[in-house]
Amino acid sequence: MVIEHIRNFSIIAHIDHGKSTLADRLLEFTGTVSAREKQDQFLDKMDLERERGITIKAQTVRLNYRADDGKDYILNLIDTPGHVDFTYEVSRSLTACEGGLLVVDASQGVEAQTLANVYLALDANLEVFVVLNKIDLPAAEPERVKAEIEEIIGLDTHDAVLASAKEGIGTKDILEEIVKKIPPPKGDATKPMKALLFDSWYDQYQGVIILVRLVDGTVKKGDKIQLMSNRKSYEVLKAGVFSPEMRETPMLSAGEVGFIIAGIREVADAKVGDTVTLLHNPCDAALPGYKEVKPMVFSGLYPIDTSQYEQLRDALAKLKLNDSSFSYDPETSLALGFGFRCGFLGLLHMEIIQERLEREFNLELITTAPTVVYRVHGTDGSLTSIQSANQLPPTQEIAYVEEPFILASIHVPNDFVGGILALCEEKRGVQREIKYLTPTRVMVVYELPLNEVVLDFYDRLKSITKGYASLDYELLDYRQSELVRLNIMINGEVVDALSLIIHKDKAYYRGRELVSKMKELIPRQMFEIAIQAAVGTKVIARETVKAMRKDVLAKCYGGDITRKRKLLEKQKEGKKRMKNVGNVELPQEAFLAILKVEG
């Protein structure tokens, strides 16, 4: 295939703006998928992707299209994940393209994540053109949205394509625009092979399958390839393209997008953003922009039924095969038993993993409150990174603690700005800017501690704005903060699973809230139970669950007072003894409810 006739493009869109449906129409129009095989959201292979309507892993498909100029073109659609947690993956997928379609819902306008991804595309020097989707809706306002795109992003929209993926309107116009506007890939098939690895997943029969975009050179079955970040080498067993099922081809050459199967055992070896080259004729330098992805949010996962521990371990190992950005280590808790401490890229990533464990592996799990990575500077000059309250050293050994801050951009309709500002202030935010994008939409930019965002920020953001807000964030830096460890004690015993790292100013309110919640949840016993919240040795809140009392005098009809007194004294003694040996059984609901207490 002549390199001039290849077009590599991706579709940039916010969740729910119709990206996957548009991809379905392009597949049908070019005859890539017959009507019989058709199913909605063809490229979203996981059930969860279909259900939540989001794309989690990048997918690619090759479309053959005969344009109006009579020439045959190969169009490679690289489908990118659209969510904030997967920004690095998006940036790598975009680097594999020369152009992008910015799909915007004609009834809703520009959203925060669309913006973030468009900026990534423009940074990667992609040719971006605009498609206004859902123009068949009665609420569609194409002219207003065009003006908004020009105002906010600065893209020219006078020749934007008006389309409705659902009705199939405008599909041909989009394909023609791709051929006309997006430049062909630059590359030289005679140079040593150099390819960008932009996704990988595990197949239980063939090992790891990697998706690559060849920049220079060619690759075919039998070649020995090398991954440049770890210098590991493999023999190519199969190479080919997706159309949309996997199809082997004699070779892949510069400018093309396809897959390579080379007996790679672990996804962790095939890292997104790595450069693939030939072992015996390597390229001189790796492609720029590769970085290791580090988990940002941590949470403990414990099976409700302890006999499911082995199943949970196997399930995590299977998920890890497909998702190298996710990490897990075994941990134990006195209250919850054996479980795992898991690291995620962000909140959505965490929810998806939990949901997949419950849905695909039928596990019932308890999740501890999410935490972030703190840096603890010791009085002896040491620096340690910790992920949970139980790892925090005693106060006298800490010089100071630093926590990660993020820069959050929130897009909201202007009726809700007051509520958003109040929420950000409550979460210890520092206001950076408020910008009116249009008379009705506002962008609010805040610096926020990630610790405050991981708990319930997103849910509260959505409820304040009735679901209209969109959030995008990036990591800024670490800053010194007054953080303390808040312990919850029951009859003087610390319950490790409920310990939190929290800002000093909030400890009192949070402690009081937790103990009053616990009081409602712990069933009454035969002895009284003291529930306390403490910072260090100082108790800051207390509630008492009163004892149940058996009427020991029921069988004394009338009779002597000394007899009654003897029975009451005996009961009192018994309760005292019981309190010393009695264990308080905490119901599972108590843990689950406490994790939901608002921060």
UniProtKB/Swiss-Prot annotation:
Membrane topology, as annotated: Peripheral membrane protein
Pfam families for this protein: EFG_C, GTP_EFTU, GTP_EFTU_D2, LepA_C
Catalytic activity annotation: GTP + H2O = GDP + phosphate + H(+)
Name of the featured protein: Elongation factor 4
List of residues binding GTP: 16-21, 133-136
EC number: 3.6.5.n1
Gene3D superfamilies from the UniProt entry: 3.30.70.240, Elongation factor 4, C-terminal domain, Elongation Factor G (Translational Gtpase), domain 3, P-loop containing nucleotide triphosphate hydrolases, Translation factors
Family the UniProt entry places it in: Belongs to the TRAFAC class translation factor GTPase superfamily. Classic translation factor GTPase family. LepA subfamily.
Taxonomy of the source species: Bacteria, Pseudomonadati, Thermodesulfobacteriota, Desulfuromonadia, Geobacterales
Tree of life domain: Bacteria
Cellular component GO terms held in the UniProt record: plasma membrane
Function: Required for accurate and efficient protein synthesis under certain stress conditions. May act as a fidelity factor of the translation reaction, by catalyzing a one-codon backward translocation of tRNAs on improperly translocated ribosomes. Back-translocation proceeds from a post-translocation (POST) complex to a pre-translocation (PRE) complex, thus giving elongation factor G a second chance to translocate the tRNAs correctly. Binds to ribosomes in a GTP-dependent manner.
Keywords from the named record: Cell inner membrane, Cell membrane, GTP-binding, Hydrolase, Membrane, Nucleotide-binding, Protein biosynthesis
Subcellular location: Cell inner membrane
Enzyme class: hydrolase
